[in-house]
């Protein structure tokens, strides 16, 4: 089954990046700016894997804050940092926090094979372009799928910088969907399956 959906998590739609991360990591997180606590630990049985992928050339502060401690703790720091940065923006009322992807994983692949697939895809498609990818795999009732939250601002030596407008191009969604099919099909072939996911265009969802 091919499923690849992209949307933006924004303040204008009433969403919280920290709450969204708490749901994905099936844990309890606190949004520093609002003080709101979200606890999704009751969903822990669905969580199969969690990881944060950063660019190879990421500044030291990114490594220190988001590649240390537990993944859930690093995720909480990451999205609190993002919300704090957007809170300083002149357009904070319409702040855009993250790009969210939901991707169906081939059921033919093992857990380790799915993890390797996601690592390769996220590094090549997003991290190598400068984004941080906070991702998890949920698996319940034989429905393995990945949730990904991507940062929207470029990384500077001392913090998040300007929003990277190139990442908002509508053409990106078509490219990402095509690349996912290519990566997944390669993983299936290497696992010994004569199967292919077919990339079929869907009505384009605006990325901004």
Please describe what each predicted stretch is.
Residues 1-208:
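N-terminal nicking endonuclease/strand-transfer module with a His-rich metal-binding environment
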């Amino acid at each position: 089954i091919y499923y690849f959906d992209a949307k933006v998590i924004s303040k204008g739609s009433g969403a919280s990046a920290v709450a969204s991360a708490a749901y994905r990591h099936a844990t309890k997180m606190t949004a520093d700016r609002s003080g709101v606590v979200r606890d999704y630990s009751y969903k822990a049985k669905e969580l199969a894997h969690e990881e944060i992928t950063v660019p190879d050339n990421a500044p030291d502060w990114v490594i220190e804050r988001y590649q240390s401690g537990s993944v859930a703790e690093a995720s909480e720091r990451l999205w609190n940092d993002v919300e704090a940065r957007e809170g300083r923006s002149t357009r904070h009322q319409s702040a855009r926090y993250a790009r969210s992807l939901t991707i169906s994983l081939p059921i033919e692949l093992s857990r380790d094979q799915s993890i390797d697939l996601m690592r390769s895809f996220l590094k090549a498609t997003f991290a190598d372009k400068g984004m941080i990818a906070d991702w998890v795999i949920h698996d319940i009732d034989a429905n393995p799928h990945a949730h990904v939250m991507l940062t929207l601002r470029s990384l500077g030596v001392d913090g998040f910088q300007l929003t990277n407008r190139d990442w908002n191009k509508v053409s990106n969604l078509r490219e990402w969907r095509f690349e996912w099919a290519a990566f997944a099909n390669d993983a299936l072939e290497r696992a010994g399956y004569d199967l292919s996911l077919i990339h079929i265009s869907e009505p384009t969802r605006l990325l901004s």
